[in-house]
Regions:
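Positively charged n-region of N-terminal signal peptides that target proteins for export
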Residues: 1-5
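Bacterial N-terminal signal peptides
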Residues: 7-18
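Proline/serine/threonine-rich low-complexity linkers at boundaries of modular beta-sandwich domains
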Residues: 22-28
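Contiguous beta-strand segments within globular domains
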Residues: 37-51, 59
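Short beta-strand segments and strand-loop junctions that repeat across beta-rich extracellular domains
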Residues: 60-81, 116-126
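Solvent-exposed serine/threonine-rich low-complexity stretches and specific carbohydrate-binding patches
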Residues: 76-97
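Signal that preferentially marks extracellular ectodomain short beta-strand elements
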Residues: 94-113, 124-133
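Short beta-strand elements
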Residues: 127-170
């Protein structure tokens, strides 16, 4: 399965509250499908994620990956070509949380077939350190989330859409 990755202008959303002032961090770590094969975005899977800040000077990054369900193998597999976004810097970990998203465009399924898709959001908190007179960046924490329903997001199509999976039809 091939995807034509289309980066969107879904810029990170910055809340002005410090990380210590918001809801529990677990409430701010998720991924959802917010676009699925609509008239405005045919044959497109949109994935959006949110990650919590931790009040530090770390920088937060997200990367999105597309998966398809292989009925013959009875398992989810990563889309190999065009199914991975670049790492997107979403901002400072001093804030309560940050959001961003990415859209994957696919060739339309052949008549009589469908593609069942989901997204995976990978999250990194990166820190800079002085090591032997050089500034180096390390990954202080990393995790991932599979898409799930129930998260209202900006730029959803249709408005308010949030799902765990996306089915592309011809």
């Amino acid at each position: 399965m091939l995807a034509r990755a289309v980066p969107t202008a879904l810029l990170a959303l910055a809340l002005l509250a410090p990380a210590s002032a918001g809801a529990r961090p677990a409430d701010h770590l998720w991924a959802t499908v917010n676009v699925c094969d609509t008239a405005k975005a045919p044959d497109t899977l949109g994935v959006r994620g949110r990650m919590p800040g931790n009040g530090s000077h770390q920088r937060m990054f997200m990367r999105f990956r597309a998966q398809f369900y292989s009925g013959s193998e009875f398992r989810w597999k990563y889309v190999t070509k065009g199914g991975t976004s670049p790492w997107i810097e979403v901002g400072s970990a001093r804030f309560a949380f940050k959001e961003t998203g990415y859209e994957f465009s696919f060739d339309a399924p052949a008549a009589g077939t469908t593609f069942m898709l989901r997204g995976v959001a990978e999250f990194q908190w990166r820190a800079k350190h002085n090591h032997g007179g050089k500034v180096v960046t390390t990954v202080a924490r990393h995790t991932r989330k599979f898409t799930e329903a129930g998260h209202r997001t900006r730029d959803a199509d249709p408005k308010g859409f949030s799902a765990a999976r996306c089915e592309l039809k011809p």
